[in-house]
Amino acid sequence: TTKNLPATMRFFSEITGVKYPYPKYSQAFVEDFGGGMENISATTQIIEIIHDERELLDDDSESLQSHELAHQWFGDYVTTRDWGQIWLNESFATYMQAMWTEKLKGHDEFLYSDVRNNQNTVIQTWNSGNRRPVVTKYFADKDAMFDNYAYPGGGSVLHMLRKHLGDELFFRSLKHYLTRNAHQPVST
């Protein structure tokens, strides 16, 4: 389940231009937990993502593992000024997860499983009448900020930005964003 974690960490360090920012990285797998939660140098994740060799034929935990690891850069090393800016943490982690899919499984899988699904999720959310800007301070309840606009919506925005800027400028911009704002809160 965690065998690709060192490669994921190296990949994220390479594409951001920022070496993994902490001296260690730990993970805990627990029951009765909703997905994953990053903390500085430590992540808690649901135990159901641990798969044996047979289960790995049908499913893997790469998306959750890479998403939570990406938060070490986008969420911990650089974090948001307030909850209205949560998209900066979640969309970058979502898009980093997508780029790990691209590295691991190829460009077609990246486009189909991540980019297309992110865009379709946002379109369906919008069409269902749940509409809001990516950045907002107004939520129906405290959990509403962790929605389809913060995760796949923001990830879609980052993909559009990458396509507009081109890879060289996009990745140079990631490095600038992280190094300029290291250990500081940011806003859009």
Language-model-derived ranges and their functions:
Residues 1-188:
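Hydrophobic alpha-helical and helix-loop surface patches within well-folded domains
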